[in-house]
Design a protein with these regions (language model features):
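A cross-family phosphate/adenosyl-ligand binding-site feature
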Residues: 1-111, 115-181
Length: 181
């Protein structure tokens, strides 16, 4: 709702996603129709299940009972001093893409914060293998500013470093064109 949206274009369709499950359903339905997927959405690792007061949790003999409950009120009660939030793991959607379309060229992103370049590359390589991606664009948040955006393009046998958003866009376009040839 509050995200910056691109200008309308005849070759652009915008689908609004409210949660991880919406994304899963949209991707599963649509990914089969494409040759290249740029998976740039930062999908939350966890989603809220239920929130309750600490007293209710302490009184419970089985914490799993809270996993099947739902909060129905829109506002959180302010009567409890301490609230406990139960979360559940969401599916890793990028890891499902190749199941849905084994031939698709998959491009993903990895954003870490204040890590060494070697660690950033290592984590990006792990993502490349785990998700069967063709390319992972790795970023460190501390290396991103209004005038600079250091990014490392990590492929199976190649690393390329760029310094700006424009260089990222140009190299990404070059990679996509290469998939087509």
């Amino acid at each position: 709702r509050s995200a910056l949206k691109p200008e309308p274009h005849p070759h652009l369709t915008i689908r609004e996603i409210k949660n991880t499950n919406d994304l899963l359903l949209e991707m599963k339905e649509r990914v089969q129709d494409y040759q290249v997927l740029i998976h740039s959405m930062a999908v939350s690792d966890y989603t809220p299940v239920y929130m309750t007061g600490l007293d209710a949790v302490e009184a419970s003999s089985n914490l799993e009972e809270f996993l099947s409950k739902q909060n129905h009120q829109a506002k959180i009660s302010s009567t409890d001093e301490v609230q406990v939030l139960f979360l559940k793991k969401t599916p890793k959607i990028i890891s499902l893409v190749k199941e849905w379309n084994p031939a698709i060229h998959l491009i993903g992103f990895k954003l870490l914060v204040d890590v060494t370049e070697d660690h950033l590359i290592e984590v990006a390589r792990q993502s490349l293998v785990k998700n069967q991606a063709d390319l992972i664009i790795a970023n460190d948040l501390t290396q991103i500013s209004a005038h600079q955006h250091l990014a490392i393009f990590v492929e199976k046998d190649r690393l390329q470093t760029v310094q700006t958003k424009e260089e990222i866009a140009n190299l990404l376009l070059e990679k996509i064109h290469a998939y087509d040839s």
